From Swiss-Prot:
Matching InterPro entries: Aminotrans_II_pyridoxalP_BS (IPR001917), Aminotransferase_I/II_large (IPR004839), AON_synthase_class-II (IPR050087), AONS_Archaea/Proteobacteria (IPR004723), AONS_Proteobacteria (IPR022834), PyrdxlP-dep_Trfase (IPR015424), PyrdxlP-dep_Trfase_major (IPR015421), PyrdxlP-dep_Trfase_small (IPR015422)
Protein name: 8-amino-7-oxononanoate synthase
Organism lineage string: Bacteria, Pseudomonadati, Pseudomonadota, Gammaproteobacteria, Enterobacterales
Pathway in which this enzyme or protein is active: Cofactor biosynthesis; biotin biosynthesis
Protein purpose: Catalyzes the decarboxylative condensation of pimeloyl-[acyl-carrier protein] and L-alanine to produce 8-amino-7-oxononanoate (AON), [acyl-carrier protein], and carbon dioxide.
Residues binding substrate, per UniProt: R21, H133, T352
Organism: Enterobacter sp. (strain 638)
Family: Belongs to the class-II pyridoxal-phosphate-dependent aminotransferase family. BioF subfamily.
Length: 384
């Protein structure tokens, strides 16, 4: 099979199963509304959970940072790209989350890949929740370590897998809030199980940080857990982009030596770090708390409203509210029916989710209003 035949075959297979992905050009895709072809849609696909991407103080901070530092960092943090803005943000994050150190990464995907690649050796074992993010599972598959996956949120099966003989070290991997189902990991049980076997715990809290817990400290803090390694990302609750790894001094020093994604990547623009510092200030403020309360009320209203819909829901009390419809074609049809009513909802299909669990993945944000929730519920019942 030639290169072109291989590519053509793969694309034809995706099209035949209604799993072909396309991008849509829009304007204002992070806000309450987005524009496509001069039409306005109420946006239920954004991860901007607290509505901070449009926050005037954060926008101004990025502008001020660009005035001071320029628009790029100019290099890796190991060369010339580690500025006072980067250092200050790392210090603030570590203090906020109760860790010795924080290291900035350009994305959550890069952070997860770097961590697992740097930490794991061939005699080691990774035991990951079956629904962990693609960045974690891909990194685990590419690493020299053995990968075993436990049933979703099943600490008992996790214990069984950790009991099996292992010549090296064991790393337990999970998420704080799961990106496709929106439910939370029982981090207390998971950590206790890991500790019983001297395993380390890595938690990716991309969808919990900024949104859950006191001052938005996230899933681990709200469940009174401190994993050995915590990954937080800035494209959701923070409304910006990028990521950080929280860890001990020794792990941070180790990653600075061996995390190739960190060493060989241009660091995030200093202006972005300035904006993230401003976002953190908002998250920790009364404004941030009010946004979290607003979001929680909207989530409660939505969940109460979907009870009689003929779709499967999950045990999600987060901003991620999936409606599982089963077939790919059904999910696509529903998404299109909602867009005809000016509601922007995304259909999620395999391989992103397991076969037979295609869904509408609605995300709620503090920028939404009560009427938006009522409108999308009315549209869902009309389409149902």
């Amino acid at each position: 099979m030639t290169w072109q035949q291989r590519i053509t075959t793969a694309l034809e297979k995706r099209r035949a199963t209604d799993a072909f992905r396309v991008r849509t050009v829009v304007e204002g895709g992070a806000g309450r509304f987005l524009i496509r072809d001069q039409c306005q849609f109420c946006n239920f696909s954004s991860n901007d959970y607290l509505g901070l991407s449009q926050h005037p103080a954060i926008v101004r901070a990025w502008q001020d940072g660009a005035e001071r530092y320029g628009v790029g960092s100019g290099g890796s943090g190991h060369v010339s790209g580690y500025t006072t803005a980067h250092h200050a943000l790392e210090e603030s994050l570590a203090d906020w989350l109760g860790y010795s150190r924080a290291l900035l990464f350009i994305s959550g995907f890069a952070a997860n890949q770097a961590l697992i690649a740097a930490l794991m050796e061939k005699d080691d074992r990774i035991v990951a929740d079956r629904l962990s993010h693609a960045s974690l599972l891909e990194a685990a598959n590419l690493s020299p370590a053995q990968l075993r996956r436990f049933a979703h949120n099943d600490a008992s099966q996790l214990n069984t897998l950790l009991e099996k003989p292992c010549d090296g070290q064991q790393l337990v991997v999970t998420e704080g809030v799961f990106s496709m189902d929106g439910d939370s990991a029982p981090l207390g049980d998971v950590q206790a199980t890991a500790q019983r076997h001297s395993a380390w715990l890595l938690v990716d809290d991309a969808h919990g940080i900024g949104v859950l817990g006191d001052e938005g400290r996230g899933s681990a803090f709200s469940q009174h857990v401190q994993p050995e390694v915590l990954v937080v990302t800035f494209g959701k609750g923070f409304g910006v982009s990028g990521a950080a790894v929280l860890c001990s001094d020794s792990v941070a020093d180790y990653l600075l030596q061996f995390a190739r994604h960190l060493i060989y990547s241009t660091s995030m623009p200093p202006a972005q770090a300035v904006a993230l510092q401003a976002a953190l200030k908002v998250i920790r403020s009364d404004d941030g708390e009010q946004r979290r309360q607003t979001l929680a009320a909207l989530i409660q209203r939505f969940r109460a409203g979907v009870r009689d819909l003929p779709y499967q829901t999950t045990d999600s009390h987060s901003a991620i509210q999936p409606l599982i419809v089963g077939e790919n074609s059904r999910a696509l049809t529903l998404a299109e029916q909602l867009r005809e009513r000016n509601m922007w909802v995304t259909a999620i299909r395999p391989p992103t989710v397991p076969a037979g669990t295609a869904r509408l993945r609605l995300t709620l944000t503090a920028a939404h209003q009560t009427q938006d929730i009522d409108n999308v519920l009315e549209a869902l019942y009309a389409a149902g």
